[in-house]
Amino acid sequence: MGKKVIVAMLLMISFVSIQAQTNNKEQKQAEKIEDPDNLATEYFSQIMGVALSATSNLKLYQFVYDWIGTPYRLGGGTKRGVDCSGFATELYNKVFSTLIGNNSRNIFSMVNPINKEELKEGDLVFFKIGSRSITHMGVYMGNNKFAHASSSKGVMISDLDEAYWRRYYYKGGRLLASLRD
């Protein structure tokens, strides 16, 4: 009878130990998933089709992730509603600590125009949609993707290779050195 009790106790201790290890692993996995930085990284890795490298500007990606789905509002610059230049202005203020204008045409005057092939994370992209002047802008994220406030879907990520954006793309721009920092 003593051996049965000892075996039963050993089995119970083993079961409790295994259960505790399983719970600890599940808790660590849940913490990893709920970490906003991990969520942003996972989101952009999927959207952009590439793993974000350690050299990526994670502050940029986190900002965009936090604003995805913000509704469009002409002249807006808050999470209650934002237009394309208001979004870029907020992003540059919060991510790069740089103040830029709040109108896409005025902002274009603050950049050095660059070719599409030269675009880097954080550069600006400009569009002429149904006009001879700039009517829309966004922030380049890498891998031909850009973040912008769409009048129909709010803040979102789009691809410069999509037919619509390819048709209306005007130029890329990098903020003038005198305006940075």
Where are these regions (language model features)?
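Eukaryote-specific, low-hydrophobicity, charge-rich regions
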Residues: 45-68
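Aromatic- and glycine-rich peptidoglycan recognition patches
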Residues: 21-39, 45-49, 98, 113-114, ...
